């Protein structure tokens, strides 16, 4: 998501402390291979997959001008290496960490349905969120204690959550208050209750505490000072994505890809602007890292990035106008893990001053443009996710992280080395822990059949699309956004009305005898047809994926 739009938060700006980003020694020449790609050369099969990324290939000088094989000294100039003396010595720092003792971003508060439960996930934990009779948020484990049916497939009756399988009803702290099949004189078993999770509303986002052993630590709920500033306004969107949250975070903290992958998607992305970037790490802790970045040729680093455990990324900037007033810009990314190969993202772009031109566009227009941005990266990131699972090695064996583009990515994977032992699974820079259960069964991702079979009453469908499908824009975003859902319904109503008017006007034009009346009626029908087309286009913009059109440059 165009990090060029993000900005620096004065609350988060630490005193600049320089950390030297040391680099690892180059691979020995024995592991380096060079060949003309046009030849029939194949890698030595004895070369393990984890070392293949060290095989360097360059084309013959006759084929590619100025092609050179990087030697060890040149490697040290461009590749990210050890970031501490401890890492240089091969020693690994490990921090205490328990993934359940964290607050995870669940949903934008304004988008939680009032009339239906909402099924969500944190890693492999299924939870259900709903508003009770007092409009308070409740969060339960998403399975009925009776026969394990998903409570998110149920309905709300008088503020109670009813399982639609047998009608058991639950309220408050997960207590069962009704079992239709019990005899009149029988008491409801005490064990007929559901597990609950603590939820809190903070700055327009609902957060869930996943530990059921440790009391919620409210001080861990992230607070974003820019969003509390007077006059600060933001555009917020939610997206489900078909790749792991760690891949998502990598992508979001990678400003170098924006000019290429998102070329001309908005004014800030142009492929001719792709260039070396400068990074300065100012903070490394067990909770994350922070630092400055900017274009190397400018010699300045005006953007401040902070990653905070478990899945919060913000990119901030301050711009002083000609009157000396500071305008605060923020790009906030809340990335919730929703299982292997899946994630949910809340994006919030905001500023204390916004261009008046923004008011000329409806909010759904910015939302569909955000969907387009994610679709431009979706194929790359999904395949990257698959390769990580297949190779089963740390990222340092697979990635070639450049100092001038990938510093944040390397920092993130090194942070995972510290804390990954306390996660359900992780892929760190030097360490990995694989999931206990595979993410796929035969050709289908785990949970796919149940997902496609679900009626998902809280989410609904459109046209012939009724089953959740993360490859489709409608199910990745629209079902999670009241604004876009309402816009599509309105466009559909107007389309139907205008279509009926077109037919009626055309019929009248045939029946009337006066030439002037015929012209007037046909002209009106034509205008209504334009309206039908506009409505169809708006619906398509919210429900149809972006298709990249290649062009010769």
Swiss-Prot record:
Q: Where is the Rieske domain?
A: 103-208
Residue range covered by the transit peptide: 1-60
Q: Name one GO cellular component term.
A: chloroplast inner membrane
Chain positions recorded as [2Fe-2S] cluster binding sites: 144, 146, 163, 166
**Known InterPro entries for this protein?**
Cholesterol_7-desaturase (IPR050584), PaO (IPR013626), Rieske_2Fe-2S (IPR017941), Rieske_2Fe-2S_sf (IPR036922)
Q: Keywords in alphabetical order, please.
A: 2Fe-2S, Chloroplast, Iron, Iron-sulfur, Membrane, Metal-binding, Plastid, Plastid inner membrane, Protein transport, Transit peptide, Transmembrane, Transmembrane helix, Transport
Give one GO molecular function term. Answer: 2 iron, 2 sulfur cluster binding
The record describes the protein's role as: Involved in protein precursor import into chloroplasts. Part of the redox regulon consisting of TIC32, TIC 55 and TIC62.
What this protein is called in its record is: Protein TIC 55, chloroplastic
**Provenance organism:** Pisum sativum
């Amino acid at each position: 998501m165009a990090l060029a739009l993000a900005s620096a938060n004065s609350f988060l700006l630490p005193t600049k402390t320089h950390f030297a980003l040391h680099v690892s020694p180059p691979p020995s020449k024995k592991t380096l291979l060079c060949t003309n790609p046009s030849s029939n050369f194949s890698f030595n099969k004895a070369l393990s997959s984890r070392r293949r990324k060290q095989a360097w290939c360059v084309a013959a000088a006759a084929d590619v001008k100025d092609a050179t094989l990087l030697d060890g000294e040149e490697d040290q100039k461009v590749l990210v290496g050890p970031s501490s003396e401890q890492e240089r010595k091969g020693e690994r720092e490990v921090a205490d960490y328990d993934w359940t003792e964290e607050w995870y971003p669940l949903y934008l508060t304004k988008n939680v349905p009032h009339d239906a439960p909402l099924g969500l996930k944190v890693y492999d934990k299924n939870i259900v969120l709903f508003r009770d009779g007092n409009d308070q948020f409740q969060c339960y484990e998403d399975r009925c204690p009776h026969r394990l049916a998903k409570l998110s497939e149920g309905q709300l009756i008088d503020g109670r959550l009813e399982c639609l399988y047998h009608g058991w009803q639950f309220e408050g702290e997960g207590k069962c208050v009704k079992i239709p099949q019990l005899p009149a004189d029988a008491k409801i078993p005490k064990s007929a209750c559901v597990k609950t999770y603590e939820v809190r509303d903070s700055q327009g986002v609902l957060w869930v505490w996943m530990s059921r052993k440790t009391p919620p630590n409210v001080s861990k709920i992230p607070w974003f000072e820019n969003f509390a500033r007077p006059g600060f306004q933001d555009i917020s969107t939610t997206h489900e994505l078909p790749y792991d949250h760690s891949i998502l975070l990598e992508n979001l903290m990678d400003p170098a890809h924006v000019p290429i992958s998102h070329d001309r998607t908005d004014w800030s992305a142009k492929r001719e602007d792709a260039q070396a970037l400068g990074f300065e790490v100012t903070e490394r802790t067990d909770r994350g890292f922070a630092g400055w970045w900017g274009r190397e040729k400018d010699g300045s680093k005006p953007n401040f990035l902070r990653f905070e455990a478990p899945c919060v990324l913000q990119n901030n900037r301050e711009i002083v106008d000609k009157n000396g007033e500071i305008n605060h810009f923020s790009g906030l990314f809340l990335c919730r893990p929703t299982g292997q190969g899946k994630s949910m993202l809340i994006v919030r772009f905001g500023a204390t001053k916004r261009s008046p031109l923004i008011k000329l566009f409806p909010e759904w227009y910015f939302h569909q443009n955000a969907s387009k941005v994610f679709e431009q990266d979706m194929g790359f990131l999904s395949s990257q996710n698959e390769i990580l699972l297949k190779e089963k090695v740390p990222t340092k064996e697979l990635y070639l992280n450049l100092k001038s583009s990938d510093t944040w990515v390397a920092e993130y994977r090194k942070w995972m080395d510290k804390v990954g032992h306390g996660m359900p699974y992780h892929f760190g820079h030097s360490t990995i822990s694989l999931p206990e259960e595979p993410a796929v069964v035969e050709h289908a991702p785990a949970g796919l059949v149940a997902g496609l079979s679900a009626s998902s009453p809280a989410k609904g469908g459109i046209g012939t699309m009724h089953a959740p499908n993360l490859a489709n824009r409608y199910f990745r975003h629209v079902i999670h956004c009241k604004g876009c859902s309402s816009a599509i319904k309105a466009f559909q109503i107007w389309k139907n009305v205008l279509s009926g008017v077109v037919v009626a006007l055309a019929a009248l034009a045939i029946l009337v005898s006066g030439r002037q009346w015929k012209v007037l009626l046909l002209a009106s029908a034509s205008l209504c047809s334009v309206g039908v087309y506009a409505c169809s286009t708006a619906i398509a913009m919210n429900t149809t994926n972006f298709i990249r059109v290649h062009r010769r440059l």
